[in-house]
Amino acid sequence: MTTSLFPASDFTIPQLADLMTRSFEGYFVPINITESALLTMLKRDSIDLTSSRVMINNDEPAGIALIARRGWTSRLAAMGILSQARNQSLGTQTMHKLIEEAKERQDKEMILEVIEQNTAGVKLYEKVGFKKIRRLVGYKLENPQVESKEELKEIDIRELARLVTYHGLKDLPWQLSGTTIMQHTPPSRAFKLNDAYCLISNPDAKDIVIWSVLVKSRSRGAGLSKVLMMALLSKYQNKIWHVPAIFPEEMSFIF
């Protein structure tokens, strides 16, 4: 089957959101992308719709690939194929074309993340030349009963972004980088406790996402991240906490 690729910028946001949702039906982690969620994703992750592609077969959308770009690096932010179009080499064809286009743009690097239980996805990306770099981990904690007397101080998210750029690991994943953190806005909130910092999603919601945790270089190894987490869980009781699978495994001790 031959697939034609068209710029995602040729389609409306509602069309893209609907295609994203349908393209991930039945996947290891199905997703429901609303228009608002897609717009947030585009802004926060630097997704370029002119470089992103919609797969077309028989004049009908068959899948989507979102490409994020910063400097000389591009990232496959998401790729999904409609259930009726799977197992027909669409993924392989599309990836070869996306890599070719990245070379034409003179990108120096192309990166992506894939859930390790998605064995078909892992095989696809390795087949077209990607190499495993490291493992990313995520967690979930429901209604922890924690008491802490420590006081968190709220700070501007932009300040945290600058600190992450300066003090964070030099090879942080795309979604943890200072550049990404800079794009978060209220109702997300950033806090500090001495030399420890964090960014969370709207704390008024039942489910809260921890988007960033940082301890300044000079204070690492003193257990500040645990003190910070305890203060955070104590401040917002009766919540369901989510750590998305974007944190390098070497940072797992924080959680």
PLM regions and their residue ranges:
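Conserved acetyl-CoA-binding loop-helix of GNAT-fold acetyltransferases
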Residues: I81, N87-E100, K123-K127, G221-S234
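Amide-forming acyltransferase catalytic core, primarily the GNAT-like/NAT-type
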Residues: V128-N202
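Conserved beta-strand in the GNAT
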Residues: V54, E60-A68, R75-G80, K192-P203, ...
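Short amphipathic alpha-helix that is part of the acyltransferase structural core
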Residues: M1-I33, Q145-L176
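Active-site acidic-Proline motif in GNAT/NAT acetyltransferases
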Residues: R69, L82-Q84, Q88, E116-Q117, ...
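Conserved active-site alpha-helix within GNAT-family acetyltransferase domains
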Residues: Q88, T92, E104, E116-R134, ...
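Conserved GNAT acetyl-CoA-binding A-motif
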Residues: A102-E113, Y236-F247
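Active-site rim helix/loop that mediates acceptor-substrate recognition in acyltransferases
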Residues: V29-L66, Y166-K192
